[in-house]
Curated annotation (Swiss-Prot):
<keyword id="KW-0812">Transmembrane</keyword>
<keyword id="KW-0249">Electron transport</keyword>
<feature type="transmembrane region" description="Helical">
    <location>
        <begin position="319"/>
        <end position="339"/>
    </location>
</feature>
<keyword id="KW-0597">Phosphoprotein</keyword>
<keyword id="KW-1133">Transmembrane helix</keyword>
<feature type="transmembrane region" description="Helical">
    <location>
        <begin position="265"/>
        <end position="285"/>
    </location>
</feature>
<dbReference type="GO" id="GO:0055085">
    <property type="term" value="P:transmembrane transport"/>
</dbReference>
<comment type="function">
    <text>Part of a membrane-bound complex that couples electron transfer with translocation of ions across the membrane.</text>
</comment>
<dbReference type="GO" id="GO:0005886">
    <property type="term" value="C:plasma membrane"/>
</dbReference>
<keyword id="KW-0813">Transport</keyword>
<comment type="similarity">
    <text>Belongs to the NqrB/RnfD family.</text>
</comment>
<keyword id="KW-0472">Membrane</keyword>
<dbReference type="InterPro" id="IPR011303">
    <property type="entry name" value="RnfD_bac"/>
</dbReference>
<feature type="modified residue" description="FMN phosphoryl threonine">
    <location>
        <position position="185"/>
    </location>
</feature>
<comment type="subunit">
    <text>The complex is composed of six subunits: RnfA, RnfB, RnfC, RnfD, RnfE and RnfG.</text>
</comment>
<feature type="transmembrane region" description="Helical">
    <location>
        <begin position="212"/>
        <end position="232"/>
    </location>
</feature>
<feature type="transmembrane region" description="Helical">
    <location>
        <begin position="298"/>
        <end position="318"/>
    </location>
</feature>
Length: 350
């Protein structure tokens, strides 16, 4: 008798991988549309570049490994990986940046460990961290959101900036944001201002903030929240990791905010800034690299929320989502080992 050996998780819900990945990609659409509305067509161009590169890279690796190409490409996992990476990088980043990140995510992080179901780390976040460490200037040059940008960025301008076409030789002109500096995200601005001795209230007076939230970023996170709730409704993901992240981040931020509101932002600011909601529902919930038991998923999510807060508040990077997810990925086997449900029998009476 022949037995088929497959990768974990071994619990089947009757939904094919391609269907799950397609639903995840579809639920990203609200966030993609809002992100494009506020930050221009660069996000869509980066998305197309990442998807094309990811599929091409996966096809080449599958051919080299002697694996079926078309069947594997149809599982849509490369689509989700490419989308998450593209949505995490600046819209006007040079074209080669997303190409390098996509190839690294697919070839090194995913297929070097055996392909889908065998990778230890989230491919999109691993690709993002490699780009952030290798090219920090390009990875932190965001455009100003619509409404406060000195220069609007239409589709043609975005293409010129991304592909370095025309006399501008890149996107420096289009990256000019508020106060004559290259665009700083709300998290960047808060961290910089606090290091200069300003209070959060003084920082919130800047044009990049709309009240207590960053212009554009609140709505982007709200859109990803809406897409994430649909994923929960469709039972594509379970609630444990998402709740763990949000609860831990809320509790940690609440302590800091209550103790010193002049030097700590509110929990809701943490929730609706940077890539929080994208990570909460679309990145951290990757079943391959996360903990598997319900209690383990809660611990896994809580660890991500705590790490996000610690790095954002005390670390050198303003948005810590990628680092938090990768560190939690490292701990997932440890969590699964010590937080295992009692499958058979019961605890003996003392």
């Amino acid at each position: 008798m022949a037995f088929k050996i497959t990768s974990s998780p071994h619990v089947s819900q009757g939904i094919q991988t391609a269907t799950v990945m397609r639903r995840v990609a579809l639920c990203l659409i609200p966030g993609i549309l809002v992100q494009t509305l506020f930050f221009g067509f660069g996000s869509l161009i980066q998305l197309c570049l990442a998807i094309f590169t990811a599929y091409l890279g996966e096809a080449l690796v599958l051919k080299a490994r002697g694996r079926p190409i078309l069947i594997t490409l149809k599982d849509n996992s490369a689509l989700v990986t490419a989308s998450l990476l593209a949505l995490s990088i600046p819209p006007l980043a040079p074209w080669w940046l997303v190409v390098i990140g996509s190839l690294f995510a697919i070839i090194i992080v995913k297929h070097l460990y055996g392909g889908l179901g065998h990778n230890l780390f989230n491919p999109a976040m691993a690709g993002y961290v490699v780009l952030l460490v290798s090219f920090p200037l390009q990875m932190t040059s965001w455009v100003a959101p619509q409404g406060i940008a000195l220069n609007g960025v239409d589709a043609l301008a975005a293409m010129k900036a991304i592909f370095a076409i025309g006399p501008s030789l890149g996107n420096d002109f289009y990256r000019l944001g508020v106060d004559g500096i290259a665009m700083a995200t709300p998290l960047d601005t808060i961290k910089t201002d606090l290091s200069l001795g300003l209070t959060t209230l003084e920082s919130f007076a800047k044009p990049i903030f709309d009240g207590s939230y960053g212009v554009g970023w609140f709505w982007v996170n709200l859109a990803y929240l809406a897409g994430g709730l649909v994923l929960l409704k469709l039972k594509v993901i379970r609630w444990h990791i998402s709740v763990g992240i949000l609860a831990a981040l809320f509790v940690c931020a609440s302590f800091g905010f209550l103790i010193s509101p002049d030097t700590h932002v509110s929990p809701l600011f943490h929730w609706f800034s940077g890539g929080t909601m994208l990570a909460v529902f679309f990145i951290a919930t990757d079943p391959v690299t996360a903990a598997t038991s319900p209690r383990g998923r809660l611990i896994f999510g809580a660890s991500i929320g705590i790490i996000i807060y610690l790095i954002r508040t005390y670390g050198g990077y303003p948005d810590a989502v990628a680092f938090a997810v990768l560190l939690a990925n490292m701990c997932a086997p440890f969590i699964d080992h010590y937080v295992r449900p009692r499958t058979y029998g019961h605890r003996s009476a003392n």
